[in-house]
Amino acid sequence: MKIYPHLADLAALAGHDIGTSDWLLIDQARINLFAEATGDHQWIHIDPARASAGPFGAPIAHGFLTLSLLPVLFESAFAVADVRMGVNYGLNRVRFVSPVRVGSRVRGRFKLVSFEPLEGGAQLTVEATIELEGSVKPACVAETVSRRYI
């Protein structure tokens, strides 16, 4: 994990990678919990027997489950010591490029697109690539916008 002492340190890093997370296992239990939380019980996610005979050869994670992992992936990729809180401001683009099969591992690679100072903090636009272990193509690519406050 990279640790930046001050939020202002990120201003000079626009266009550069700012961190890469640890690998995270996507197991059936996580997929089932997400299905319960969202009400999305499609068989490609929660029925291992049927999904094994389906188009992906195994159950796959919901696309929105993959996207929802961004906070935990951010947390293991980098931290800014003087930031007391952060809030999601939005997403500019999201693409689900590859399916995430049960038993796969994913990680986040983060590139700072822009740093905009705000009163008491900054707005960060970050290109988040959720990589899929063993695959050339990522699972998900998203441009996130967050506000961090010191």
Label each region the model flagged.
Residues 1-61:
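Catalytic strand-loop segment that frames the active site of acyl-thioester-processing enzymes
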Residues 1-13, 99-150:
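HotDog/MaoC-like acyl-thioester-processing domains
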Residues 14, 20-22, 30, 40, ...:
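A generic structural signal for short beta-strands and their flanking turns/coil linkers
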Residues 19, 23-25, 95, 145-147:
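Generic structural detector for well-ordered beta-strands
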Residues 54-58, 68-109:
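Hydrophobic beta-strand-centered segment that forms part of the acyl-chain substrate-binding groove
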Residues 64-66:
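A solvent-exposed, acidic/Ser-Thr-rich amphipathic alpha-helical stretch
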